[in-house]
């Protein structure tokens, strides 16, 4: 007898579930639960995107500067630099084009600048060595960022005296 002649065992046919059975209900609820989890994860990512951009920018600066502690004026300069790099035109290119999207992003950008100059802008506290070290070692995953691990502190705009500004330009 050849191997070809041997009969293969019939494959098991998947059991058909009755639509009103408990198992069918359980499977549909699991499917709905998975969809909700995915939807909530997408919403969470969308809400955390501006914070992640801010933290990425600060992490890049901290790695470049290689300091353990920053002064308040240095943090103010970093915030000012971040707000200047974050222009509405760049954001509009990333998002699908709408007619009023450019005006909205420009007004939002202007509001952020006003908030920074008047009330203060919430950023990671780089005046503490522990938080600077945490930001240096951070791998970019937002699930590790909590209020205890990296608290946000408000910093106001600090204007540099004219003497310092002249020496910077030379």
Curated annotation (Swiss-Prot):
For this protein, the record's InterPro entries field holds: Tma16, Tma16_sf
Which Pfam families has this protein been placed in?
Answer: Tma16 (PF11176)
GO cellular component terms, semicolon-separated: nucleus
Indicate the family of this protein. Answer: Belongs to the TMA16 family.
The molecule here is called: Translation machinery-associated protein 16 homolog
Q: What is the lineage of its organism?
A: Eukaryota, Amoebozoa, Evosea, Eumycetozoa, Dictyostelia
């Amino acid at each position: 007898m050849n191997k070809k002649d041997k009969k293969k065992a019939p494959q098991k046919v998947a059991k058909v579930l009755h639509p009103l059975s408990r198992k069918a209900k359980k499977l549909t609820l699991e499917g709905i639960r998975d969809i909700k989890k995915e939807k909530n994860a997408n919403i969470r990512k969308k809400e955390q995107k501006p914070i992640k951009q801010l933290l990425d920018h600060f992490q890049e600066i901290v790695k470049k500067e290689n300091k353990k502690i920053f002064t308040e004026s240095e943090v103010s300069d970093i915030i000012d630099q971040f707000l200047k790099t974050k222009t509405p035109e760049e954001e509009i290119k990333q998002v699908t084009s709408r007619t009023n999207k450019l005006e909205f992003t420009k007004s939002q950008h202007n509001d952020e600048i006003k908030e920074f100059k008047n009330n203060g802008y919430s950023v990671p506290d780089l005046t503490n060595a522990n938080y600077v070290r945490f930001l240096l070692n951070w791998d970019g995953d937002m699930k590790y960022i909590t209020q205890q691990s990296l608290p946000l502190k408000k910093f106001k705009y600090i204007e540099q005296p004219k003497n310092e500004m002249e020496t910077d330009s030379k």
